[in-house]
Amino acid sequence: MKMGPLGAEADENQTVEEMKVDQFGPGHTTLPGELAPDSEPELIDSTKLIEVQVVLILAYCSIILLGVIGNSLVIHVVIKFKSMRTVTNFFIANLAVADLLVNTLCLPFTLTYTLMGEWKMGPVLCHLVPYAQGLAVQVSTITLTVIALDRHRCIVYHLESKISKQISFLIIGLAWGVSALLASPLAIFREYSLIEIIPDFEIVACTEKWPGEEKGIYGTIYSLSSLLILYVLPLGIISFSYTRIWSKLKNHVSPGAAHDHYHQRRQKTTKMLVCVVVVFAVSWLPLHAFQLAVDIDSHVLDLKEYKLIFTVFHIIAMCSTFANPLLYGWMNSNYRKAFLSAFRCEQRLDAIHSEVSVTFKAKKHLQVTKNNGPNDSFTETTNV
């Protein structure tokens, strides 16, 4: 899985002509401004056009601005307001940290690389930027999977105890540790070098460099394995979990107005989390599909607008980094109240969870028996 700005580059096995295609667009064998004998002027790739670059600058800057503000706000309210410090919200804050990493460390350099056509940010960032984006995406995927499994365990099986806050911190730490290990090839197998396109003209390249004689096959294996393990499989688990949760909530009959209100809160929270997963899956699908096409058929690299297509799909994928805070504010009243309180610089958030605490504080565990059948009894906790 080739993450970030360097995913649009070919590997170290490219010929000079192929590197020239990357730099100046398909069909070019001369420097910009020069014409081959008896040839017509050729259009360089669209990312070199000023109007396209303006659109790309606006798109990336908007994503960065919205992402930094929104994700910082999510982290702030979870840390500041005690009533927001629930296990689910800790996982949501972890998603925000991962997205913030992409917004601040990856996207500015992605934009710079796209506009300049070569890597001008030095060898350290050559290794760090693709690694950071791969790390963040993998952390997000693991966290979304953990949230789905936790809610499935509590709602479908009516378990009395949820994950404790201490265990949630351990899970978050493990998510970052496992992701750091899985993303490490993106930093290790990379080379920062000068490549001579034509005599007396060099560009700075940051390319994949896999070991062994069959270098290309290792990159393909890693890319396909990452796609399966960190996209297809987790989304399968998440889809299964939320399908069962949705079925359980839809078919449940609540005996009493108080519990019915609590049940509705769970439905709303589940809807919000499902939307987060859908946005993540849909936004990343075009980029994953396009990269899969490249891995299967390298001739895709010969497309005239390959770089523009990759960049557009990358922008779509990055929209997920600012969409989550918008979903929280739109679909969850607790986050909406917390955001407003943060803007007003309020120190407390007394209103939050008030409807839950008043009704259920005296009934931390509510035993419900449906149709007087012992097999239908279950226990609900108040932490939504």
Curated annotation (Swiss-Prot):
Compartment(s) of residence: Cell membrane
Superkingdom to which the source organism belongs: Eukaryota
Disulfides per UniProt: 126-206
S-palmitoyl cysteine: lipidated positions: 345
GO terms assigned for molecular function: neuropeptide Y receptor activity
Its membrane topology: Multi-pass membrane protein
Regions that span the bilayer: 55-75, 90-110, 128-148, 169-189, 220-240, 272-292, 308-328
Function: Receptor for neuropeptide Y and peptide YY.
Family per similarity comment: Belongs to the G-protein coupled receptor 1 family.
Protein name as it appears in the record: Neuropeptide Y receptor type 2
Source species: Bos taurus
Organism lineage string: Eukaryota, Metazoa, Chordata, Craniata, Vertebrata
